[in-house]
Every structure is written in structure tokens, then in C-alpha cells.
Regions:
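Conserved GNAT acetyl-CoA-binding A-motif
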Residues: 95-107
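Conserved acetyl-CoA-binding loop of GNAT-fold acetyltransferases
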Residues: 118-126
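Residue-level recognition of the GNAT/N-acetyltransferase active site
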Residues: 9, 75, 108
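Short amphipathic alpha-helix that is part of the acyltransferase structural core
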Residues: 1-32, 47, 126
Length: 130
């Protein structure tokens, strides 16, 4: 894995997350992130040696039983090097430290093998978009 350091609940400018989203081909959603960052239960960031955000995910939780991983993102230059698996592992570690036992994640079918390698069991679920 490349020289990436991980931090839970790092102080990140919304624009850094938007830059990372854009790097993977997602919409920047700049107008959403100031409020979204306030609503997350936790976040995990991965930073390169220049302290640039290269990996990130958000966690929402009831704080008791359930947590959901959102927006697991790794910059394309760092994909395929174990950064994503470490990012997810750090998120799971933080969740388990709070005695939360059920962790959910939604993903596209082409990401199934990745999440299985991270320890997730694939089951049926549903997404409702308003």
C-alpha cells in the first residue's frame, strides 16, 4: 500500500471531499457537504505525504446497534493498492469500538468482490430514491 495515513473524524474542508468525488467521476455536490459533514456520525480520511485527501468515507449511525458506510471513495491514483480495504477496515474498527454490531453498505454490483474481501456478506436490500 502506498504511504497513506488514516484519521477518524479529521477536519476536512468540504472542497477536498468534492475534489475527491470529482476525481472518481462523481458529482461534486459542493452545496451539500457543509451540512452533510455536520450530520455524519463519523468520517474516516486517508491522506498522502502531502496531506492531500486521497480516500474518504462517511458513517451514519444510531449510535447503538446500526451503522452505514457511505461514499467510500479512493482517488484513482491510489486504487488497487489496498487503500480502500484499509479505509473500510478503519471505519469498521471505529464502529466496533462503539459496540455497534450491524454494519451496512450499499454498492454497485461491480463492487461486490471488493466488499466481500472487506468481510461483508451480500444480501438482499433495497434503495428508494425520492
Amino acid at each position: 500500500m502506498s504511504n497513506i495515513s488514516f484519521s477518524t473524524n479529521p477536519n476536512i474542508a468540504p472542497s477536498a471531499i468534492c475534489d475527491l468525488r470529482e476525481a472518481v467521476g462523481w458529482a461534486r455536490q459542493e452545496e451539500d457537504y457543509p451540512a452533510a459533514l455536520q450530520g455524519y456520525w463519523a468520517t474516516v480520511g486517508g491522506f498522502d505525504v502531502a496531506n492531500t485527501l486521497v480516500a474518504w468515507c462517511a458513517i451514519v449511525s444510531d449510535g447503538v446497534r446500526n451503522a452505514v458506510l457511505l461514499d467510500v471513495i479512493v482517488h484513482p491514483l491510489h486504487q488497487g493498492k489496498g487503500v480502500g480495504r484499509t479505509l473500510v477496515a478503519k471505519a469498521i474498527e471505529h464502529i466496533k469500538a462503539h459496540h455497534i454490531t450491524i454494519i451496512h453498505v450499499d454498492f454497485l454490483p461491480e463492487r461486490t468482490a471488493f466488499y466481500q474481501r472487506c468481510g461483508f456478506r451480500v444480501g438482499l436490500g433495497g434503495i428508494y430514491e425520492a
